[in-house]
Structure formats: C-alpha cells, structure tokens
C-alpha cells in the first residue's frame, strides 16, 4: 500500500474511534505529533489492542492522506506502572498533556521525546518506591515541566530581571528580598503590584537549579525544599503555562490535589 512507513514513538493519548477502532496520538522524532487510526483495537483479542497511553511503540503505518492507519504494532516499553500511585499517574499525564501543547502538528521538536522518556523513567521508579515519595514526585514533575517548556521555546526566564535586565542573583539569607512573577513578562526584582506570585531568595534559587539535569539534593542525599515550596514552584509553572500556551492543564491541578491529599503538601 502506498505511503507505508515505520514510526517509533510514545503514545500520548488514546481514545475511541467508531465502534471498534481507536484514535492514537503519537509523539515521534520523525513526525512530531501524529494522529493515527488503529483498526479493530477495541475488539477482544485484537493484535493491535496494545495501543494504550504512555507506551513506547514501533508501528507499521499505511497512508499519508487523511487519517493514516496502523497495520502492525510492537510495544517497546510500557510506562503503565506509573498508575500504581495517583501522584505519579497525574504527573505522567501532565507531561503528556504539555508535550501535546508544545508540538505544532507534524513539526518535530528535537530532544522532546528523549527528554519526556527520561522523566517518565524517573516517575516510573518513584511509582514503585516504598514508602511513597510524593514530594519527590512533585519536584520531578515541576523540573520536567521546566525542561519541556525550555525545549518548546517557552522557557521560564529566570536569569535576569524582565524590567531592567539585571541578573537575577538571589541574595540567600536576606529574607526580606522578593522577586515577582509578572505572567506576561517574566521575573522582576522586588515586590511589585500585579505580580501573580512572589518568591523569596531560596525559592528563586531552587527554581533556577531546575534547569540542570538532576534534581537539587542536599549533601545528605535528601531533596532540597519542603513540600510547600515545591507547591509554590508548581504554581509558577501553572501560571506560566496558562499565560503563554493555549490550553489549561487539568493534570497539573490533579497533581496538586493528589499531593495535598497525601499529606505531604501544606497550604
């Protein structure tokens, strides 16, 4: 059949399509976000029934006009274990949702798939942790959003003041110092009217460290920052996404509720 091709990618979203088929939304390095029909995937014992969310798939696809169809499917890796904990499930759904918002149709975003897979691997490990580590899950989620936003061209401008260009160098120990999040502009030095949020020096320093590959850890191996600080940084990310991207992210709200319900977040 004309237009046959092989695609490797992560299933971000799967929904019903007619009575027996599924609609698969795939993120790949080759094509960005692609929507594909998976014929018969809702039938019992279908060979294509493995088309489920958060799975790394190898697909044989036919057709280039209209809605292409999946002819063969192989699961390379499944991240369904993130569903063992509500916090890791909400976090994984949030990352999938954000990735969909960042990719403009069939325009690939270099590095996005690998970065998303890296953070899903971290969430997968946290989903199996005993006892549960909701604060670390929250921190991983905030950092993952920071990384994905930067790749998508919507990075948080945490290096200089948006009003005068002065370097944002938080004076640790000066607790009266404040930095204001101005949703349309970025971060400005001082407690300014119209700010969505204000951060103290340690909160800004923690946010700046999220640009690095690893989470910020203390010398004793424990995560830096208490739950209430990570919830504030989540609010920063939520505000930035709400202002600069076209859709509200429901999954981040679910994550916030799950963290607070776990008792590891205080308001």
Curated annotation (Swiss-Prot):
Transmembrane annotation, as ranges: none
Gene Ontology terms describing biological process: DNA recombination; double-strand break repair
InterPro entries: ARFGAP/RecO, DNA_rep/recomb_RecO_N, NA-bd_OB-fold, RecO, RecO_C
Domain of life according to the entry: Bacteria
Gene Ontology, cellular component aspect: bacterial nucleoid
Keywords: DNA damage, DNA recombination, DNA repair
Recorded family membership: Belongs to the RecO family.
Biological role stated in the UniProt entry: Involved in DNA repair and RecF pathway recombination.
Protein name: DNA repair protein RecO
Organism: Prochlorococcus marinus (strain MIT 9303)
Upper taxonomic lineage: Bacteria, Bacillati, Cyanobacteriota, Cyanophyceae, Synechococcales
């Amino acid at each position: 059949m004309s237009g046959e091709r092989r695609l490797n990618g992560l299933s971000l979203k799967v929904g019903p399509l007619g009575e027996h088929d599924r609609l698969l939304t795939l993120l790949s390095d080759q094509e960005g976000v692609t929507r594909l029909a998976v014929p018969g995937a809702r039938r019992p014992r279908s060979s294509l029934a493995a088309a489920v969310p958060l799975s790394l798939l190898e697909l044989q696809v036919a057709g280039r006009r209209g809605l292409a169809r999946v002819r063969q499917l192989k699961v390379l890796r499944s991240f369904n274990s993130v569903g063992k904990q509500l916090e890791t499930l909400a976090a994984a759904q949030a990352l999938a949702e954000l990735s969909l918002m960042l990719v403009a149709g069939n325009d690939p975003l270099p590095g996005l798939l690998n970065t998303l897979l890296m953070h899903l691997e971290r969430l997968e490990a946290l989903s199996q942790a005993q006892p549960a580590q909701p604060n670390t899950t929250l921190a991983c989620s905030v950092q993952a959003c920071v990384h994905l936003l930067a790749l998508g061209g919507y990075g948080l401008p945490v290096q200089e003041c948006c009003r005068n260009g002065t370097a944002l160098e938080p004076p640790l120990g000066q607790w009266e110092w404040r930095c204001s999040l101005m949703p349309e502009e970025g971060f400005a030095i001082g407690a300014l009217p119209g700010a969505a949020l204000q951060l103290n020096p340690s909160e800004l320093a923690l946010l700046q460290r999220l640009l690095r590959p690893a989470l910020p850890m203390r010398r004793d191996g424990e995560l830096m920052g208490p739950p209430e600080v990570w919830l504030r940084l989540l609010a920063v990310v939520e505000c930035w996404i709400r202002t600069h991207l076209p859709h509200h992210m429901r999954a981040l709200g679910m994550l916030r509720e799950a963290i607070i319900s776990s008792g590891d977040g205080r308001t």
